[in-house]
Amino acid sequence: MRILGLDVGTKTVGVAISDEMGWTAQGLETIKINEERGQFGFDRISELVKQYDVDKIVVGLPKNMNGTIGPRGEACQQFAENLRELLQLDVVMWDERLSTMAAERLLISADVSRKKRKQVIDKMAAVVILQGFLDRK
């Protein structure tokens, strides 16, 4: 059983995958998307689901600090619902507040250059989201 973790942004989707035991999350890739053109990366996500034999997807839900859901959160919920319908898989939402900041701190502490951080931040945020989910199940 593998679980895919997604950090959905306006221009990219960070992707992470669990190990087969469901204990650890590893970054896979960053998928470029274009919301305005209706390009959400579903084809690539579908390929990854098949390639890694995924049976659950965790999508980060960006909440405001007071717990409310704003426009970005609503867009992520719609993204998750579209995935659920398209792939016929269990898709769960996971509170991702501060996941990008946590990923940034991780990369800084690992002495990753600013240029490289920019390239991998979404993938690392997906790792933080998925690892949070795995740690709590």
Swiss-Prot record:
Signal peptide location: none
Function: Could be a nuclease involved in processing of the 5'-end of pre-16S rRNA.
Upper classification of the organism: Bacteria, Bacillati, Bacillota, Bacilli, Bacillales
Any GO BP annotation: rRNA 5'-end processing
Statement: the UniProt record of this protein carries the keyword Nucleotide-binding: no
Protein name as annotated: Putative pre-16S rRNA nuclease
HAMAP family: Nuclease_YqgF
Origin species: Bacillus cereus (strain AH187)
Cellular component per GO, a single term: cytosol
